[in-house]
Amino acid sequence: MKKGLLTGLLLFGFFFGAGNLIFPPTLGYQSADQLWPAVIGFIVSGVGLAIGTLLIGTVINGGFKKELDEKIHPIFSLAYLIALYLAIGPFFAIPRTATVSYNIGVAPFLPDSKSGLIIYAAIYFAVAFYLAYNRSSLLSSIGKILTPIFAGLILFLVVVGAFKFGQTSPELAGKTDLTAAKAFGNGFIEGYNTLDALAAVAFSVVAVNTLKEFHFSSKKEFEKTIMSVGVVTAIGFSVLYIGLAFLGNHFNVASALAKDADLNVGSYVLTMASRELFGTFGQAFLAVMVIITCLTTTVGLIVSVGEFFEETFPRFSYKVYATVFTLIGFGVATLGLQTIIAFSLPVLMILYPITVVIAFFVLVNKKVAFSKRGMQLTVALTTIISTVSSLASALKLEGLAKALEILPLQGLSLGWMGPAIIGILIALILPDKIKGEAFDFEAFQTK
């Protein structure tokens, strides 16, 4: 029981960040009277893919890189992991933590000014850099204590908010054409924004090293603990997401305000709901907790990404990479939260489908033999379709977008699934089959 609880807190700590707070309320507001299909879509991608990928990573002999080298190609493996670490690092996740903490924790107390964000980001990244440069464990230790407390407080906010605002009807203006299927697709894509499935690939190495410290007595105990913790963590996040989405769905956001391109609805809902329910003190308390949680996440990401690049390209030291990535994160953060989200989504719509296919092959190939060429074809098809689809959407290429509608589920931004399934079937038919190694529990315990 103790191992399960500790492991659950470990997994929760890996994923919980301010980004997990702002997207469910935004989705709730946008989904109008189609809240449940939207939330289910969000949970499938934001919870299911993330926790599934991390759990798969804990039962791989050698990690995702070794699997990609063997099943696909070392060059693809390197390119994919570099793109992934840059996404969860200096380009998207790191600057987003700064902007989210500013939007929720600082901006409500300041006059509207661009300089406020720049000054805050400079101080924020100076502190983060100092802690990451010296690889301080202090903030990590604080984060392990504060993260579950903060999550509990957010859940309390959600429960109180449900009673306070639950009778308010969802905003339907301009959303009458939203179907259940479209809402599910919107929720599924919105779940990409959490970045958790991508982070799971990176954090699986840390998870394995931490799990080794528990000294499981048998493989059965290890597997039972992992599965039960996965279920419990999934339920916990799902309850949190449902509550936050419900709050966003029923909290009154003026239509004119919601149209402001610089406003993040999720941040606004959390901030204003805290103020209405608990007054200025409650809002200030939320602000402090968000800033500390975000700072913890930022330091952890700078360290993880810096260590990956130091190991991959040892010509430069960790401290050089930490410096460079902190500066990049600061520069991107000054663009503002909405701009970061807008630029990140097209990239995530490419990386997420690839990650799903990779996780599928890594898991299933332990039991079912697949052709190596077939697996390469599947990843190639997924990469091409998701890239073309993302570009068509981002660049508003109507002709290309129309042509892609021939693909099943393309209307839900899941057009890559059809070609991926065809690739998987081909991988089952072609002769050059290989089978992944079974999880070596003894080696896991002794390494």
Please state what every model-predicted region is.
Residues 48, 52, 149-161, 226-253, ...:
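Selective recognition of specific alpha-helical transmembrane segments in multi-pass small-molecule
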Residues 64-69, 240-295, 346:
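TM-loop-TM module centered on a large, flexible mid-protein loop between adjacent transmembrane helices
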Residues 134-145, 184, 207-236, 254-261, ...:
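Hydrophobic, small-residue-rich membrane helices and short re-entrant helix-turn-helix hairpins
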Residues 59-67, 125-146, 213-216, 330-343, ...:
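Membrane-water interface regions at transmembrane-helix termini and the short interhelical loops
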Residues 133-161, 344-356, 375-385:
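Membrane-interface loop-to-helix entry segments
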Residues 183, 375-447:
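A generic transmembrane alpha-helix motif of multi-pass inner-membrane proteins
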Residues 90, 94, 151-179, 197-198, ...:
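Hydrophobic alpha-helical segments and their helix-loop junctions in multi-pass secondary transporters
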Residues 8-16, 86, 160-166, 177-244, ...:
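Hydrophobic, membrane-embedded alpha-helices of multi-pass small-molecule transporters
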